Amino acid sequence: MAASLRHMAHFQKALLVAKTAPRLSTIVRATSTLNDGASKVPDHSMHFKLERLWAVGMLPILPASYFIHGPVMDAVLTVALTLHIHWGIHGVVYDYARPYVIGEAAAKAAHIGVYLITGLLLAGLLHFNTNDVGITKAFELVFSL
């Protein structure tokens, strides 16, 4: 009988805890429209179109840089290549270095790294253009081999 009373007391305590503890499967009612989630995501279609237009715009610059040498063409080619490479690397990092995949700190470091790489690329190309033969003359020298 004593064991039965102990079990009954234990059962009553468990029942009391179960009544006062929050439920894990509580139904939460939420009202939403269909476009609520979609409005929070930025639209990258315009950026994608701009990248494609930029790439198409680079098509005449590359052959022209073989025939036209000088600081202006070097600067145009430097800016065009730097932006094209930056957008490409940024797209890869944006797609594959998301915070929920690699962690918040690593994702932030990857995005900062994109801008560091772009800055170093721009500085290196500008240094090459001003202190050496320049990009267009370098292309001519490479193709003359």
UniProtKB/Swiss-Prot annotation:
GO terms under biological process: mitochondrial electron transport, succinate to ubiquinone; tricarboxylic acid cycle
Task: Cite the annotated pathway.
Answer: Carbohydrate metabolism; tricarboxylic acid cycle
Q: Name one GO cellular component term.
A: mitochondrial inner membrane
**InterPro entries of this UniProt entry?**
CybS, SQR/QFR_C/D
The subcellular location is: Mitochondrion inner membrane
Q: Which GO terms describe its molecular function?
A: heme binding; metal ion binding; succinate dehydrogenase (quinone) activity; ubiquinone binding
Q: Which residues form a coiled coil?
A: none
Q: Which residues lie on this side of the membrane: Mitochondrial matrix?
A: 1-52, 95-108
Which positions bind heme?
H84
Q: Which UniProt keywords apply?
A: Electron transport, Heme, Iron, Membrane, Metal-binding, Mitochondrion, Mitochondrion inner membrane, Transit peptide, Transmembrane, Transmembrane helix, Transport, Tricarboxylic acid cycle
Membrane topology per the record? Multi-pass membrane protein
Annotated TM spans: 53-69, 76-94, 109-129
Which residues are exposed on the Mitochondrial intermembrane face of the membrane? 70-75, 130-145
Tell me the residue numbers annotated for binding a ubiquinone.
Answer: Y96
Family under the similarity heading: Belongs to the CybS family.
Q: What does this protein do?
A: Membrane-anchoring subunit of succinate dehydrogenase (SDH) that is involved in complex II of the mitochondrial electron transport chain and is responsible for transferring electrons from succinate to ubiquinone (coenzyme Q).
Against PANTHER family, the record matches this protein to: SUCCINATE DEHYDROGENASE, SUCCINATE DEHYDROGENASE [UBIQUINONE] CYTOCHROME B SMALL SUBUNIT, MITOCHONDRIAL
**What's the protein here called?**
Putative succinate dehydrogenase [ubiquinone] cytochrome b small subunit, mitochondrial
Q: Which organism is it from?
A: Caenorhabditis briggsae
